[in-house]
Amino acid sequence: MFDEKDLIIDARHITRRFPAAGGKELTACNDINLQLYRGKTLGLVGESGCGKSTFMRFLVSLDKPTEGEILFNGKDITKLKGEELRLHRQHIQMVFQDPTNSFNPKMKIRDIICEPLLNFKKIRPSEKDAVARKYLEMVDLPGDFADRYPHNMSGGQRQRVAIARAIVLDPEVIIMDEATSALDVSVQKNIIELILKLQKEKNIAIGFICHDIGLVRSVAHQIAVMYLGNIVELMPAEDLPQKAGHPYTQALMKSVFDINMDFSKKIESIEGEVPSPLDVPPGCPFQNRCEYCREKCKTDRPLLKEIYPGHKVACHFCQQIGEMEK
C-alpha cells in the first residue's frame, strides 16, 4: 500500500506476556505485525485495555516484547542496551496523554523544551531561550511562553508544548498515546491540525493511539483495529466505514456520534463484556460479543487475510457478513 523505501519501523510477530497469580500468563499483545512509514500515520484503535499502548511502548523502547523483533531502519531495537539505546531514543519520541504528568512542575517551559537537546549536547545552555521561542512559535504558541510554568497554561497549550518537546530533536517517528483524548473537541481539532501540519513539513512517521475510531479515521493513513491483544483488522483509512470487514470494527463505527446523523436512529453499543485476558476462549477472541458467531468461531482462531488490496481481516465469515450488511 505504501512505498517500501519509506518503511521505517517493521514490528514482526510481537508478543508480550506478563506473569500472573496462580502460574497464569496474561497475553497483552499476541503475534502483532505492523509497519510505520515516513510521512504516514498508523492509527491503532480499540477499547481500553486491548493492548494498544503496550504495543506502542515497545516502539519507544519503554518495554521489551517477550517474542518478536522491531526493526528500525533495518536494525532490531529490542536488542539495544546502554549508550547505544540512549542514543537511539532521539530518533523516536512520544507524546503522552496527560502532558502535566510528563512535565516537571518546577521547570519553566524553556527548560522543558530544551532538556532533550541538552541531554544530547546539541545546543549550549546560552541558546535555550532562542531555541525554546522558535519551537513554541512552531506549535503556534507565543515565544514569551518560554518563561511560564506548566501550571500557568491550559491543557491544550501544555499539549502543544509536549509536541514541541517531541519534535525538538527532529525525530523520524513520533508516538502519540491518546494525545488528544483529554482535550475539548475544539482544542482537539486544533491539535490534530497542528500534528498534520508538522508531519507534512518534517515527513515524520506517526503512531496514533486512540479509542475513538471516528477521530482516527480523520488522522490516519492506515488503521489497525485491536481487540484483546490481537489485530483483528488492518486497512487503509479510506476503507472506513463502507468496507469495514470485522464485526468489531463495524460495531465501533456504529457507536460513533455524528452531528449530521439521523437522530431518530439509536446510537448502538457493543453487547457483552470483554473476556478476562487471563482466560481468553479458544477460537476467535470476539466470539462472545459477536452476533454472527458460529461453531467454527469457537474452535478455530481466525488469521488476518486480505479481502481488498492492503486490507486484512481476521474473521472466518467477513465476506458473508459483508453481504448480509448490504
Task: Mark where each language-model region is.
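A short, proline-enriched helix->beta-strand linker immediately N-terminal to the Walker B motif
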Residues: 168-172
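Conserved ABC transporter NBD signature motif
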Residues: 68-76
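Helix-to-loop junction immediately C-terminal to a conserved catalytic motif
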Residues: 60
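Charged, flexible cofactor/metal-binding loops and thiol motifs
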Residues: 2, 25, 236-326
